């Protein structure tokens, strides 16, 4: 299937790119998410005319996302959970919970689909989580999962100590 991107898509292309993609990927993801349109002759002509509009709109969205990224950057989210004796959680910390807490902290609604978890958080500790609000921009937040507030503070002190040691080694 041949498509024209109308929004930038990570690892695929930028606005106005004409690409051949698998039929299922185009039909089930790109078209319903309004990331692309079919590459017919009338659509190709339309994109040539409207490419500047799409790019201006994307630039405006990108500027807004950069402001949000500045708020998100260096956030530390603390989750207090019950655990077994070996530090394993009863359940897990989900991307929805991270999105809700982050939205609460910065007063801006973040969707759970913007939270990228490499693997589920199922034990206490410090985790880095990627927040992707735009195809070309992402932010990193620190998620601390602990049994109590005092344990969370210990994790924070430990992280600051490691960071200062890393800075001393690199100097």
UniProtKB/Swiss-Prot annotation:
Keywords, in A-Z order: Ribonucleoprotein, Ribosomal protein, RNA-binding, rRNA-binding
Family: Belongs to the bacterial ribosomal protein bL9 family.
Gene Ontology CC terms, in alphabetical order: ribonucleoprotein complex; ribosome
A single GO BP: translation
Function: Binds to the 23S rRNA.
One GO MF term: rRNA binding
Protein name: Large ribosomal subunit protein bL9
PROSITE patterns in the cross-refs: RIBOSOMAL_L9
Domain of life: Bacteria
């Amino acid at each position: 299937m041949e498509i024209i991107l109308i929004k930038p898509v990570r690892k695929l292309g930028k606005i106005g790119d004409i690409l051949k993609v698998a039929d299922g990927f185009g039909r089930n993801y790109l078209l319903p998410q309004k990331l692309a349109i079919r590459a017919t002759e009338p659509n190709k002509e339309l994109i040539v005319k409207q490419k500047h509009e799409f790019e201006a709109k994307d630039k405006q969205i990108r500027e807004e996302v950069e402001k949000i990224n500045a708020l998100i950057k260096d956030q530390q989210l603390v989750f207090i959970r019950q655990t077994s004796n070996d530090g394993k959680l009863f359940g897990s910390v989900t991307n929805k919970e991270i999105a809700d807490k982050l939205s609460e902290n910065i007063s801006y609604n973040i969707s759970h689909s913007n939270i990228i978890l490499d693997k589920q958080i199922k034990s206490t500790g410090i985790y880095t989580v990627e927040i992707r609000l735009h195809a070309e921009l992402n932010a990193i937040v620190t998620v601390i999962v602990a049994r109590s507030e005092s344990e969370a503070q210990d994790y924070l002190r430990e992280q600051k100590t490691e960071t200062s040691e890393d800075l001393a080694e690199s100097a």
